[in-house]
Swiss-Prot record:
<keyword id="KW-1133">Transmembrane helix</keyword>
<comment type="function">
    <text>Light-driven chloride pump.</text>
</comment>
<keyword id="KW-0681">Retinal protein</keyword>
<feature type="transmembrane region" description="Helical; Name=Helix A">
    <location>
        <begin position="26"/>
        <end position="51"/>
    </location>
</feature>
<feature type="transmembrane region" description="Helical; Name=Helix B">
    <location>
        <begin position="58"/>
        <end position="81"/>
    </location>
</feature>
<dbReference type="GO" id="GO:0009881">
    <property type="term" value="F:photoreceptor activity"/>
</dbReference>
<keyword id="KW-0675">Receptor</keyword>
<keyword id="KW-0600">Photoreceptor protein</keyword>
<feature type="transmembrane region" description="Helical; Name=Helix G">
    <location>
        <begin position="226"/>
        <end position="254"/>
    </location>
</feature>
<dbReference type="InterPro" id="IPR001425">
    <property type="entry name" value="Arc/bac/fun_rhodopsins"/>
</dbReference>
<keyword id="KW-0157">Chromophore</keyword>
<keyword id="KW-0812">Transmembrane</keyword>
<keyword id="KW-0868">Chloride</keyword>
<feature type="transmembrane region" description="Helical; Name=Helix C">
    <location>
        <begin position="106"/>
        <end position="127"/>
    </location>
</feature>
<feature type="topological domain" description="Extracellular">
    <location>
        <begin position="22"/>
        <end position="25"/>
    </location>
</feature>
<keyword id="KW-0406">Ion transport</keyword>
<keyword id="KW-0472">Membrane</keyword>
Length: 276
């Protein structure tokens, strides 16, 4: 028993190089990070080429927002692969892995905090939504990511982990409401409803996978290993970010006139004109 306690202490005080060694020894975890880094690099080059012919400021703004998604991802995944944003956490009593030290790639939450608002910004611009609705969606999204990080890092109480998880899901419901209820009408008025509907469905379905993975992974009930969970997150990121962004930019490049005519200012609101 004392030996186990000593080992636990060593893990908790592990240096960055030791964490890196642990990552590299886990093939599933390590490969899930480097595959994403490689794809992000390819996507960045592709998006640069796709945006070269854009002329209108609105189309360029959508391009910049979309471009930031792989830029944030490659930076964040590099932090994960280097061990910079990964650490060991001792799970609290009541957790399936109570008393054990679990490798926590908490840097993923940094990726989501900075990249998912850009996805929503691009979608909001595409739908020509009003500033208030766009601000609501982005702030709710940031709240979702931050409370998700809290749920992953809390080790003082197993109950509190799930409390933060519930709060994060509540923020997520607010984001879903905006995407499913408010913005479709704006997109219809802006003439972008067809592509918006496709991207909305892709986003909603894939984003629902993240809280499910959290609950099933080592942070939740621990039915999935860290490596399997990491591949799940990486797969969702590839589809929800890179595939989403490619579909959006391809449509914008082919329909720049529609994007330009959708609205000349962010605060115009595509669904209804402002009262005089």
């Amino acid at each position: 028993m004392p030996a186990a306690s000593t080992a636990a202490t060593t893990l908790l005080q592990a240096s960055q190089s030791e964490v890196l060694g642990e990552i590299q020894s886990n093939f599933l975890l390590n490969s899930s990070l480097w595959v994403n880094i490689a794809l992000a690099g390819v996507v960045i080059l592709l998006f640069v080429a796709m945006g070269r012919e854009l002329e209108s400021s609105r189309a360029k703004l959508i391009w910049v927002a979309t471009m930031l998604v792989p830029l944030v991802s490659i930076s964040s995944y590099a932090g994960l692969a280097s061990g910079l944003t990964v650490g060991f956490l001792q799970m609290p009593p009541g957790h399936a892995l109570a008393g054990q030290e679990v490798l926590s790639p908490w840097g993923r939450y940094l990726t989501w905090t900075f990249s998912t608002p850009m996805i929503l910004l691009a979608l909001g611009l595409l739908a020509d939504t009003d500033m208030a609705s766009l601000f609501t969606a982005i702030t709710m999204d940031i709240g979702m990511c931050i409370t998700g990080l809290a749920a992953a890092l809390v080790t003082s109480s197993h109950l509190l982990r799930w409390v933060f998880y519930g709060i994060s899901c509540a923020f997520f419901i607010a984001v879903l409401y905006v995407l499913l209820v408010e913005w479709p009408a704006d997109a219809e008025a802006a003439g972008t409803s067809e592509i918006f509907g496709t991207l909305k469905l892709l986003t909603v379905v894939l984003w629902l996978g993240y809280p499910i993975l959290w609950a099933l992974g080592s942070e939740g009930v621990a039915l999935l290993s860290v490596g399997v969970t990491s591949w799940g997150y990486s797969g969702l990121d590839i589809l929800a970010k890179y595939v989403f962004a490619f579909l959006l930019l391809r449509w914008v490049a082919a329909n720049e006139d529609t994007v330009t005519q959708a609205g000349m200012s962010l605060g115009s609101g595509g669904a209804a004109p402002a009262d005089d």
